[in-house]
């Protein structure tokens, strides 16, 4: 997009409303997108909170004797196969997140010689899965990739945040 066009668009945005409350960014095709600054900050805080809770869940699983690793694959429901997860990135600066697979973690625990429990763990602060996430969980369980899938949910006890694990089979596959 030409510099004159960007200036003209920015001028029109300023004329239309309060430009101090909005931030305009440009996508790959040069199309402007305006966002409220308050919502940008709220998204940043939510991502940071989610990342902190993810670390807490990982530490908790490791304390319970499981070997935990970030799951870097996803399910393509149309093809019915596992595919590498796509990276999320900001085209103007850097890679934002690398591990965007579903579920978040794979946790392995040795039961006895030659037998292991392999579970998938999806971390959600509110414990709610979308319809697509539920379909992916069902697919993983039907194909026998994971023996169980747990949903790690944040539970408040006063100021302290605890972790509650919900078994996907028990809650959704009755």
Language model features: what each stretch is:
Residues 46, 71-112:
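Active-site metal-binding core of divalent-cation-utilizing nuclease and nuclease-like domains
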Residues 44, 48-58, 131-174:
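Domain-level recognition of nuclease-like catalytic cores that cleave nucleotide substrates
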Residues 69, 121, 150-152:
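Hydrophobic/aromatic beta-strand patches that form the interior of the parallel beta-sheet core
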Residues 96-99, 114-119, 126-138:
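Active-site-adjacent loop/helix micro-motif of nuclease/hydrolase catalytic cores
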Residues 61, 104-109, 114-127:
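Conserved catalytic cores of phosphodiester-cleaving nucleases, focusing on short active-site segments
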Residues 75, 127, 156-158:
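Residue-level detector of flexible, active-site-proximal loop/helix-junction positions
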Residues 1-85:
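Interdomain/boundary linker segments immediately adjacent to catalytic/signaling cores
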